[in-house]
Amino acid sequence: MKKLLAILSLFFCMTVTLMAQQVVTTWLSDAVVPGEQTRLFIILTDGSIARQDPLPRVKGASLRWVSQGNYIRWPGSPNQSAFLMAIEVTPDEVGTVEIPSLTLQANNGRTYTTLPQTLTVYPYSAIKWNTLNLNGTAVPYGMLWHVDNQKPYVHQPDRCELKIYAPEYILEYTAPAITTSNLATWRFEPTLVELLRGQPRGSVLYKGVNWNVMTFQSTLFPLRAGEVTASGTVTARAALPEADPLIANFIRSEVLVEMAIPEVKITAQELPPGAPSSFTNAVGNFRISSTTDARDLSANEP
């Protein structure tokens, strides 16, 4: 029960922090393969409209604005809405793409600055491939796990992404059903902007096929030191391939299919020496206190 309350407290704190910030950045996916199109979303939570000035050149990827911006619902902001801008990022090599801080000029005269962003680019070999049998046709699909920290501390949050690479036959997904060993996890959900407003999924052209990319995000919490694992299944709605193109123009049959999620392994570490004995979970079950003799303080005075 304490662990559940701690996790809920962490989620509440993150939500309040997002609502308080005037500039929020979030990725459609921050782990991709070369050629995969992803998006960096910039959200002005006060509803200001910013100019789309030329973007910087970065090593290993191309950047471009992909929309004039639009409004989305954002609780806690004026009129309950925020201004959303999107940058399409397409990497061309394996490694890490570093995007510097961006300065945005708004129509109200304000200047907004984003934090530097990092995009991880995996080799194609990191995708684990499998096949579905749809109406006698073998339909391939792939999955890729991204975990921020491969060696987290016990009970500490470790953000992750599960990415699905599928052809056009796969139409939509339910939330993945995850099976874990010595590991707790949040429910896997689509990315923030997909939840707030339906946004295009990622895509990548690989071996002559245009793969649609769906990303689910979550957080892992190792429960003990050593190797911990996660795997599972995800249910998808798929269109059955029709042998006769003429019939396919008028009739489309659909079916629910179960897609296997490959196992991911991480190695959890014991808490470091000197950690408080009650440092037990993601939020921290410990006490922070301070004292001061001063009665009158100036801004930013220690």
Language-model-detected regions and their locations in the chain:
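Sec-dependent N-terminal signal peptides
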Residues: 4-15
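Surface-exposed interaction/ligand-binding surfaces
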Residues: 20-302
